[in-house]
Amino acid sequence: MITGKARVAGVIGWPVGHSRSPRLHGFWLARHGIDGAYVPLAVAPEALERALAALPALGLAGVNVTVPHKEHALARMDALTERARRIGAVNTIVCQSDGRLLGDNTDGFGFLENLRQRRPDWRAGHGPAVVLGAGGAARAVCASLLEAGCPALTLVNRDQGRARALAEALAAWSPVPITLATWDEAPRTLGGAALLVNTTSLGMVGQPPLDLDLRGLAPSALVTDIVYAPLETPLLARARALGLATVDGLGMLLHQGRPGFEAWFGVAPEVDDALRAAVLGKP
C-alpha cells in the first residue's frame, strides 16, 4: 500500500512506454513491502533541463535515465561518480538530502554482474575481449571490462572514427592495449578472444540479425549479447550451436537497477529467476 510518506522514483526517457524498469522496480517494491512507487516519466529532450531541476522540489528519491537523455543529463549533475565520468553518461540519479543531484552510471556494473551470476567461473582477466559496436553501451561495457582486469580489447565497428574516439577516451585512463577492426576484419579478431560481446542493436526484434562467423572462437570463449528481446538472439543461438558458453542480455538490465534501488529505497535487492520471469511477463 502506498501512503502519504511513500518514496517515489522513476525513469525518464523519450519515449518511455517501452521501458521494463517499472516492472523491475515494482517487483522489488512488492517483494520487500516498501511504501514506495516507481513510475515512467516521459520527458521530451527540450524539457530535460527543467525536469531534472524539478526532481528535488517534487520530493523524488531519484530517477533512472534512458534514451535519449543519458549523455545530456551528465552536464546537469551537481556531482558524478567516477564511473559515470569515465563512461560520459548518466543512467541513475540520486536526489541527495541537500537537493543536489548525484549522477551515476550502472550499466557497466550490470553487465559484469550478469556475467558473474550466470557464469560464476568467468573472470575478465581470462583473456582478451572483442566488443562489437562503439556507442554508449559499448563505452560502459568496455570501461567495466578494463576496470575488472581485461588484458586487451578489440573494438569492431563500421564507423572507425567513432571507434577511434572511444578507444582514445578509454586510453585516457587505462593502459590496456586497444585494437580497432572493421566488420570485414571481425572474424580474424576472434582467435585469441576469451569474450565476445555484442553491444549493437543487431539481432534485436525488428532489426537485421548479426551475421558473424564464430568458428574462429576458442571452445572456452564466452559469447554474450546485451540485447534481451529476443532473449536468445541469432548470435547467441549460433554460439550455442557451436557448443560455446552464452549469456543473454536480460541480466544486465536487472543488475544495473540494483544500485539505484538501494540508494532510493534503502534495501539491497536480489536478482533471481522469479525476477527474470516477472520482467519477462511470465506467470
From Swiss-Prot:
The keyword Amino-acid biosynthesis applies. Coiled coil: none annotated. GO terms for molecular function: NADP binding; shikimate 3-dehydrogenase (NADP+) activity. It is an enzyme of class 1 (oxidoreductase). It catalyses: shikimate + NADP(+) = 3-dehydroshikimate + NADPH + H(+). Pathway: Metabolic intermediate biosynthesis; chorismate biosynthesis; chorismate from D-erythrose 4-phosphate and phosphoenolpyruvate: step 4/7. Its EC number is 1.1.1.25. NADP(+) binds at E82, G133, A134, G135, G136, A137, I226, G249. Shikimate binds at S19, R20, S21, T66, N91, D107, Y228. It holds the Pfam family Shikimate_DH. The keyword Ribonucleoprotein does not apply. Belongs to the shikimate dehydrogenase family. Involved in the biosynthesis of the chorismate, which leads to the biosynthesis of aromatic amino acids. Catalyzes the reversible NADPH linked reduction of 3-dehydroshikimate (DHSA) to yield shikimate (SA). HAMAP family: Shikimate_DH_AroE (MF_00222). Homodimer. This is Shikimate dehydrogenase (NADP(+)). It comes from Rhodospirillum rubrum (strain ATCC 11170 / ATH 1.1.1 / DSM 467 / LMG 4362 / NCIMB 8255 / S1). The gene is aroE.
